[in-house]
Amino acid sequence: MLLATASLKAADQPSLAERLGYKATDKLLIVNGDDAGMCHTANLATTECMEKGFMRCATIMTPCPWFPEIVSYAKSHPEKDFGVHLTHTSEWGKYRWGSVAPSDQVPGMLDKQGYLWPEVMDVYGHAKPEEALIEGRAQIKRALAAGIDVSHIDSHMGTMQMHPAFVKAYVQLAVEFDLPIRMASQETLSKMGHPELRGEISAKGILFPDYFVYEELKDEKKQDVKTFWLGVVRKLRPGVTELYIHAGTPSDELKAITGSWQTRSQEFEVFTNDEEMKSLIAEQKITPIGYRPLRDLQRKERQQAK
């Protein structure tokens, strides 16, 4: 019934693009930079892509050691759009981090060494959704206390987006802080057996892009990253689409942290310097946007609905 109501409401109101001030036929693209704050290289590449490329927003990992650096940039560039990359895992073998919340409040979130679990399934197997909620709230509050004008939230490695109980906590945070969220596509949710989620969340007044592109690079060392992303952008539909990248450069630091440094470096180049991508976006009349317009619209609409 809730889904049906949400569907009727969606059919009666203008599209998200129109509510943002565009035409229903316009193609709006959010290129979000995941993993800001993770390390120095990630910060440098993310900010350069925001300044020179098509990235219009990025999400920050508040538990990570290089969080203060990205905070400094965000505060000195208030026009830039930053959200929180809710981080409930610490996946790199030689570079780890713990929780923002006190460990006694989230014991199930931490391994024997006091770090966040390396895999999403570890989180589901050891932590309660309530602990994920506490940790997520602590991370958002940390960003706000640091002076970041938080525009949206998403989930590192999708931890808060792939299990119904954790999705509930994810949405609770969105409602509590009145923030738009990254949301899996309708096709993905249907495959997961939860086709109703988009309708239920929309009924709460929480906004999310019409479409979400999940990055499926099967072999990071051999996949043609540029061809992959050109294909994605070429197929964009009218409305608001989000895709995410992990911007990086081939630094010794990034090479020491992750085996995906090549993919991260290539994604940075494609969305910052690549002439073919620039031409394609111009030819397709695609408008890059960030999440801040969605946040402002959401807060306006939810206030009007009271």
Predicted regions and their residues:
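Acidic (Asp/Glu)-rich catalytic clusters
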Residues: 19-21, 46-52, 69-81, 98-111, ...
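Active-site beta-loop-alpha junctions enriched in small/polar residues
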Residues: 36, 63, 85-91, 156-158, ...
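A short alpha/beta connector and helix-capping loop motif
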Residues: 40-64
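Active-site gating loops and adjacent loop-to-helix segments of metal-dependent hydrolytic enzymes
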Residues: 97-123, 259-262
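C-terminal domain-boundary segment and adjacent tail
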Residues: 181-184, 257-306
